[in-house]
Amino acid sequence: METVAVLGTGLVGNWIVRSLSSDGYKVIAIDADKSILSRLNDVADTIHGIVDEDLINSLDTDIFVNALPGRVGHRIRKILVEKGKKIADLAFTPEDPLEINQLAIDNDSILIYDVGVAPGLSNLLLKEANRRHGRLSIGRIRVGGNPTTKDDGWSYMAPFSPVDVIEEYTRPARIIRNGEVVTLPALSERIRFEISERGEMEAFLTDGLRSVLQTIDAEELIESTVRWPGHIDMYLKKKEELSEEDLVKAWSWDTNRPEFTWMEVYARGEGNSTWILDDNGDEKGSSMARTTGAITCAVVKFLIKEKGIYGVHPPENFGNDLLEMCLNEYSKNNIKINEIKN
């Protein structure tokens, strides 16, 4: 079996390491935090250190998962591409990964980016909707990971880097409206709606469409993040008085608190399709860790299987072949995604 190096072993990276190891792959786990890395000693070779060019050069593998925070993720993906690696890239960065497409081609490297739930699985479902229904009059993604119950405070805990969440709340949102890409303020177009068996939630625009702005044929295309009502009101009220460090502490993960990940992808063209993901997690990991990590693991297996493909690609470039592998990975991990027949 192939050896896979996983860069970053937070909640999602940890799940990826354990899943790939259980599937028989040799895994090398790398992180700067010794305390979280030590939890993986039983399933992987572990390396404690800062990910840099020297560390990458020391690793005897061509398959990498970039699960680093967005602020460092782009710098590392460039190093990996220059060295001709195959990369499943989970780092959500302000930089466009396609900037290094030619670099990847020149170095016989392949990088598939945005390999999570949204962006990631959402891209593949929209591509499938295009295949079924032609040009979409509307494509809509609503997605979020939240505690199962509301509280008197933030009603939130960050399932990935809290710093990335803050950037999500501040980066202007690019959407498609009337067939054109337009930019709107983050957190705008707030709407309350009901989730079956969950209750009333609130959705607001965030900049998660990324590659599908170019790859999906649609008259209108939007992505919204979902939170409990009151969360964004509190953020808007307190964002000037709280530092980044304050928010990181306030949104820290509580492993004992029940949580869920929910996503709806709705598409209408010549016909319509709706997919709903609703997951509570299990004893092996949080809902966001496993719903995200399973997509990343499917991409790793796709990269190992495919030969002679180079460049930087969003997942939807590989259409139904990759979608089937992702859905199979979900099924294997008992993650339910339901298509609603309309």
Please report, for each region that a protein language model flagged, where it lies by residue.
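ADP-ribose/adenylate-binding Rossmann-like module
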Residues: 79-97
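NAD(P)-binding Rossmann-fold cofactor-contacting core
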Residues: 27-40
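Conserved N-terminal Rossmann-fold NAD(P)-binding element of oxidoreductases
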Residues: 4-8
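C-terminal catalytic/substrate-binding lobe primarily of soluble NAD(P)-dependent oxidoreductases
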Residues: 132-342
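Hydrophobic/small residue at the entry helix of a nucleotide-binding pocket
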Residues: 12
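N-terminal Rossmann-like NAD(P) cofactor-binding module of classical short-chain dehydrogenase/reductase
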Residues: 63-67, 87-89
